[in-house]
A protein has these predicted regions:
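Outer-membrane beta-barrel "beta-signal"
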Residues: 108-109, 132-144
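Detector for outer-membrane/organellar transmembrane beta-barrel domains
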Residues: 3-91
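C-terminal hydrophobic structural anchor segments
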Residues: 71-124
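Transmembrane beta-barrel architecture of outer-membrane proteins
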Residues: 29-31, 63-65, 99-103, 133-135
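Surface-exposed beta-strand edges and their flanking turn/coil or helix-capping segments
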Residues: 26-28, 59-61, 94-96, 119, ...
Length: 144
């Protein structure tokens, strides 16, 4: 990969990989990605694009995704965050897995070693036959 920092706090990254197929009937997987992000002590913003060829080593099963991220530090103990993803497959081969996902939440730093992050997530499938899914989580981090 290649990482550029054209100005302070701005990061641009381009990278890729190739996973060789082990079976003669399979096709190798190529992953290509680009990322741009800005981060300072008050907030961060980022966007990413990913493209994968031959998903699960199957010829022509290409897919791509766009993601955006944001965090805002309200103070030293509280921050809010969000993420949005759009996933799609070439020629609709994975229509059940295509769609949009979103997440919003808050992180609370409780003392020096504990963080709690309640968050809400939604999955909105592209196919109209499946209803949206909604989830509520409470993530906890304990460190020493």
């Amino acid at each position: 990969g290649l990482t550029l920092t054209p100005i302070k706090n701005l990061f641009i990254r381009l990278y890729g990989s190739f996973n060789e197929a082990t079976e003669k009937t399979d096709k190798g997987i190529t992953n290509l990605a680009s990322f741009i992000g800005f981060k300072n002590k008050s907030f961060s913003l980022a966007a990413e694009y990913n493209y994968q060829t031959n998903t699960k080593y199957t010829d022509g099963h290409d897919q791509s995704g766009v993601s955006t991220y944001a965090t805002i530090n309200l103070n030293k103990k509280v921050g809010i965050f969000g993420r949005w993803d759009y996933l799609t497959s070439k020629d609709k081969w994975n229509e059940e897995g295509d769609g949009m996902a979103g997440m919003v939440g808050a992180e609370f730093r409780i003392g020096k070693y504990i963080k709690l992050a309640p968050n809400f997530r939604i999955w909105s499938p592209k196919s109209g036959s499946t209803p949206n899914s909604y989830y509520a989580y409470l993530n906890a981090s304990f460190s020493l």
